[in-house]
Design a protein with these regions (language model features):
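C-terminal helical cap and adjacent loop that interface with cofactors, partners, or active-site loops
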Residues: 61-136
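Active-site-lining helix/loop region of Rossmann-like oxidoreductase modules
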Residues: 1-72
Length: 136
């Protein structure tokens, strides 16, 4: 919101269980039919009383066992409008690790103190020697 020049005046968050209708087994856990297999997290950011940011973030084990095909979907309403789908989704752990590793030189180069992503360069893949990106 800050990068868009918006001031969020209210934030709402919802968390609802995802109950499975089939048995689900993964390397990380088991949920039998009727049990909770995950959580559907949603959140809205309001600007001038209108929901300008709407996030839907379900997390569950083995969703495909119930016929749910996951992906990352981004919709920007504007001029021009943007609608993007990434299927299959980028594994959250891998995506997070990639972001953290590629930001290491930028964090080292940052001024001391608490920083946000707005204070650092735009994230990108660094394919070379990280030492070449660290200021002396």
């Amino acid at each position: 919101a800050e990068a868009l020049g918006w001031k969020v005046d209210k934030f709402e968050q919802q968390m609802k269980p995802i109950v499975t209708s089939v048995d689900r087994k993964s390397p990380y856990g088991f949920a039998k039919a009727g049990d909770v297999a995950g959580v559907n997290m949603t959140g809205q950011g309001y600007v001038d009383g209108a929901a300008k940011i709407d996030m839907i973030h379900p997390q569950q084990i083995e969703p495909e066992l119930e016929g749910t095909h996951t992906g990352d979907y981004i919709v920007l309403k504007g001029s021009p409008a943007v609608s993007m789908a990434i299927n299959p989704e980028v594994d959250g752990g891998i995506g997070t690790i990639a972001m953290i590793v590629n930001m290491i030189p930028h964090v080292i180069n940052a001024r001391p103190g608490l920083r946000t992503m707005l204070d650092l360069p735009v994230p990108r893949a660094i394919m070379g020697d990280f030492r070449d990106y660290i200021e002396k």
